[in-house]
C-alpha cells in the first residue's frame, strides 16, 4: 500500500497525539481546525512495506512478518471448516486439500467447498481421498498447488523462450494477460516454491520447474542449440 506525504502527516499526527489538524478554506481566510480523536489502536498490513515512508513505518510500535501456513496447520483448518460445514471428510483428504492451498487458509476453505460440491454429486457427500484428488484435478489444481495459469507461465517460458530468461511483458503478451496480474498474483508463489527465478535479464525456469513439467532441462536446451 502506498501513501502520499500529506496523508502520512495526518496519520502520524493521529497515531502520536490522537489529534488531526485540518486546514479550512485558503488564502487570507485559511484557518486550522483541530479534531480530537478517541484513543485507538491501529493495525496495518501490507505486502509492500518498502512503499511506506520511513517515518510512517517507524510509528508502528510492533512490526512482524507473517509467514505462510504449513501443511499440517492448514490441514487442521480444513478439518475445522469441514466441521462447521457438517461435512464427512477423512484426515488424508484434509491434508491433500491443505498441501494444494498455497499456504493460504482462504484458498483451503475455497477448495474444501469445491471438493464438497464434487462429493455431493459423485459420492453422496462423503469426502475421501479419491474424490478429493478427482475434484482438485478437475479444478486444474495440481499436487503442488499450481493452477492452470501457473503451469501456462512455466510452459510458455520453457516452450517459447528456451526456459528464459525472458521479460515479464513478453510473457504477459504471450499469455494475453496483464503484466501486473502475473507479477502480483502468480509470480510470487512460483518464485517462493522455486519454480522460477528472477534475473537481471528476466524470468527463468529452474530445474525444479522443468521437473514439475516432466521435462529434462538438458534435453530441452539441446533442442534450441
Regions found by a protein language model. Give the residues of each.
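C-terminal helical "lid" of AAA+/P-loop NTPase domains
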Residues: 95-99, 106-121, 155
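Conserved AAA+ ATPase core "coupling" helix
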Residues: 51-84, 91-99, 110
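Terminal-proximal interaction/regulatory segments of ATP-powered molecular machines
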Residues: 157-225
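AAA+/SF3 P-loop NTPase mechanochemical coupling elements
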Residues: 26-45
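Conserved C-terminal helix/linker of AAA+ ATPases
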Residues: 118-140, 150, 205-207
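Short regulatory helix/loop adjacent to the ATP-binding pocket of P-loop NTPases
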Residues: 12, 34-37, 47-61
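Single conserved hydrophobic/aromatic residue that forms the stacking wall/gate
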Residues: 1-6, 10
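The conserved phosphate-sensing helix
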Residues: 101-114, 126-128, 146-147, 165
Amino acid at each position: 500500500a502506498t501513501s502520499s506525504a500529506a496523508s502520512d502527516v495526518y496519520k502520524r499526527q493521529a497515531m502520536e497525539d490522537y489529534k488531526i489538524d485540518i486546514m479550512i478554506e485558503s488564502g487570507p481566510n485559511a484557518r486550522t481546525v483541530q479534531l480530537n480523536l478517541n484513543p485507538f489502536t491501529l493495525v496495518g498490513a501490507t505486502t509492500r512495506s518498502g512503499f511506506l515512508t520511513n517515518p510512517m513505518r517507524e510509528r508502528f510500535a510492533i512490526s512482524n512478518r507473517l509467514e505462510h501456513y504449513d501443511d499440517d496447520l492448514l490441514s487442521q483448518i480444513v478439518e475445522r471448516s469441514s466441521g462447521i460445514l457438517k461435512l464427512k471428510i477423512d484426515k488424508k483428504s484434509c491434508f491433500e486439500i491443505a498441501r494444494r492451498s498455497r499456504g493460504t487458509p482462504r484458498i483451503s476453505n475455497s477448495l474444501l467447498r469445491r471438493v464438497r460440491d464434487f462429493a455431493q454429486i459423485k459420492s453422496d457427500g462423503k469426502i475421501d481421498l479419491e474424490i478429493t484428488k478427482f475434484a482438485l484435478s478437475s479444478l486444474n489444481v495440481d499436487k503442488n498447488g499450481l493452477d492452470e495459469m501457473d503451469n501456462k507461465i512455466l510452459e510458455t517460458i520453457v516452450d517459447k523462450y528456451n526456459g528464459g530468461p525472458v521479460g515479464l511483458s513478453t510473457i504477459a503478451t504471450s499469455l494475453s494477460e496483464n503484466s501486473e496480474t502475473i507479477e502480483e498474483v502468480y509470480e510470487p508463489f512460483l518464485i517462493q516454491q522455486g519454480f522460477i527465478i528472477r534475473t537481471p535479464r528476466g524470468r527463468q525456469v529452474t530445474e525444479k520447474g522443468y521437473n514439475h513439467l516432466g521435462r529434462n532441462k538438458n534435453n530441452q536446451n539441446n533442442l534450441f542449440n
